[in-house]
Amino acid sequence: MGRTLENKKEIVADLKETLGESTLALVIEYQGLTVAEISDLRRRLRPSGTVCKVTKNTLMGIAIQDDEKWQPLSELLKGSSAFLLVKEDFSSAIKAYQDFQKVTKKTELRGGVMEGRLLKEPDVKALGDLPSKEQLMGQIAGAINALATKIAVGINEVPGGLARALQAVADKENGGDDSAA
């Protein structure tokens, strides 16, 4: 028994809502994966806030039809498609997919769309090589901390340097008095 029209409308509405929250959509060929393997992929993607949707290409086509941001996705809608809808941390999501692909070797990345731009496989791999959000925040925090430390050391050096200079002048004057006497 096929899906009812009402059911299809619900699926399209759900896809539109998920796409609205997403920054990146990846399309993979998933033919040959078992239910357990798809569940494993979803489990791996969950920590990065990524949703894996397996739906008909026509329903995804209807969902993106009125949204220019996702229009390029229509070029990737063919065959058995699974959609990885990434909300924020696309680097972690791509790495999670690549790890899954290394284990199963059953999927093929067709491409993706980010900010209205069609991404081919090399583009997606380049995005995956970027540091994750947490790593970037750590690097920024480290740089800020290092800057604050340098400022504190610099501020402490000014009075210390001044005190040493005054002491040197005082020693010179005292030493000069001793030799004159």
Swiss-Prot record:
GO terms for cellular component: large ribosomal subunit. Gene3D superfamilies: 3.30.70.1730, 6.10.250.290. One of its GO terms (molecular function) is large ribosomal subunit rRNA binding. The keyword rRNA-binding applies. InterPro entries: Ribosomal_uL10, Ribosomal_uL10-like_sf, Ribosomal_uL10_bac, Ribosomal_uL10_bac_type, Ribosomal_uL10_CS_bac. It comes from the Bacteria. GO terms for biological process: translation. PROSITE patterns: RIBOSOMAL_L10 (PS01109). Keywords: Ribonucleoprotein, Ribosomal protein, RNA-binding, rRNA-binding. Forms part of the ribosomal stalk, playing a central role in the interaction of the ribosome with GTP-bound translation factors. HAMAP family: Ribosomal_uL10. Part of the ribosomal stalk of the 50S ribosomal subunit. The N-terminus interacts with L11 and the large rRNA to form the base of the stalk. The C-terminus forms an elongated spine to which L12 dimers bind in a sequential fashion forming a multimeric L10(L12)X complex. Belongs to the universal ribosomal protein uL10 family. PANTHER family: 39S RIBOSOMAL PROTEIN L10, MITOCHONDRIAL. This is Large ribosomal subunit protein uL10. It comes from Trichormus variabilis (strain ATCC 29413 / PCC 7937).
